[in-house]
Amino acid sequence: MPYLLEMKNITKTFGSVKAIDNVSLRLNAGEIVSLCGENGSGKSTLMKVLCGIYPHGSYEGEIIFAGEEIQASHIRDTERKGIAIIHQELALVKELTVLENIFLGNEITHNGIMDYDLMTLRCQKLLAQVSLSISPDTRVGDLGLGQQQLVEIAKALNKQVRLLILDEPTASLTEQETSVLLDIIRDLQQHGIACIYISHKLNEVKAISDTICVIRDGQHIGTRDAAGMSEDDIITMMVGRELTALYPNEPHTTGDEILRIEHLTAWHPVNRHIKRVNDVSFSLKRGEILGIAGLVGAGRTETIQCLFGVWPGQWEGKIYIDGKQVDIRNCQQAIAQGIAMVPEDRKRDGIVPVMAVGKNITLAALNKFTGGISQLDDAAEQKCILESIQQLKVKTSSPDLAIGRLSGGNQQKAILARCLLLNPRILILDEPTRGIDIGAKYEIYKLINQLVQQGIAVIVISSELPEVLGLSDRVLVMHEGKLKANLINHNLTQEQVMEAALRSEHHVEKQSV
């Protein structure tokens, strides 16, 4: 039986640099292939070649789809063939309805007039196919990210998709939303729709894939049956070396208490009747990594936003640093108290995409380079930028390159470099490795470990329970704004954390000092 897709000996160059070097990929109808590799490995370039974003003639090699050679000059050419790609940054128009998004550019008309009745009927069938129980008239901006992802799939199905490409589809989804999405993909597989799945979450890759294709430095390293590969096998192929331990296995010597929060309560910015954080108290020691776990809506991010002075609503409670009560109502006051934060959404809150890498690093510490006068000491700033880039191993062709052009992992390292310029005593990391590859994760985990060895106290909020458990000395478990458990991490399991989150009564254990 012929393959649905064959990409033969694809090479794509930018100037003298080969982004893709003689890569081949093939899959059958109804097959799920995961494409794995570090950021910058060439995955996105290969998919842009396949989809016609890089047109025929701009690359070497051959693409055969459904028995015919594709020579696409535009993404619409491949869409007509039945190839659809859903990017991590969803391409929906938030102000339009679900129906309007699904039929955007593919409206059903009769005599030049749109047939809304027929489109509504078709839309309802598409939504049912992706298990979405919503009205076609719902505004997309009112949907959660998981629902928006399913609308994107419904939009692809409306184009008679035969090959669906999903690029980091679960990066911003909850575990429940992820489970729903994977079930939808399996259902599509039963209907003969093939899928190329791109994700840094190797547990998902293992769960969903028939085969796994690994690319490193623009070259095809290997394609194997998923059933015969472990996560360690995938990592070794991706990074070219064996990572014996993803999380640093070094004991932390904790010091005195540096932070204590008492009876923190925060209200919804608009609806004062809703408590997003409800009477939460906890402490933090020097040289300790404190993980905060919980489902989406648990109040984790809201808690640390209050601590950093950026929660947009009202809140009350007491914050003590070194035993002294402090008042923190904005980020400047937090920084003055020795607190720095890497935000949850780095693209929205962490970087200025069009600004240079170096300027992003020094953005919060420009007073270091003024010497009490208004004029900036450019030489001192450049020296500091180069040292930070070297220390954090930020991969960039130049400090003057716009940071938006870097991979997610290198953007995150630049934000960490900015935080370290503030000489923090308390470092808050909200989703520190979201959307970055395994190699960059490993480097960030090593850096976190080095910081706590220096006595810096670290708070880690993560939706990935293995990350929380792999890093933390102690884990706070939150649910619906309340602190449900305070657990010493002596071989804690994911099941124990989830049980603590979902049990009805409080279960706050005493800390061992």
Curated annotation (Swiss-Prot):
Subunit relationships: The complex is composed of two ATP-binding proteins (XylG), two transmembrane proteins (XylH) and a solute-binding protein (XylF).
Domain of life: Bacteria
Family label: Belongs to the ABC transporter superfamily. Xylose importer (TC 3.A.1.2.4) family.
The name this protein goes by in its record: Xylose import ATP-binding protein XylG
Swiss-Prot/TrEMBL keywords: ATP-binding, Cell inner membrane, Cell membrane, Membrane, Nucleotide-binding, Repeat, Sugar transport, Translocase, Transport
Keyword Membrane (UniProt): yes
Binding residues annotated for ATP, in chain numbering: G37, E38, N39, G40, S41, G42, K43, S44
Domain ABC transporter: 5-242, 259-505
Lineage: Bacteria, Pseudomonadati, Pseudomonadota, Gammaproteobacteria, Enterobacterales
EC number: 7.5.2.10
Catalytic activity: D-xylose(out) + ATP + H2O = D-xylose(in) + ADP + phosphate + H(+)
Membrane topology: Peripheral membrane protein
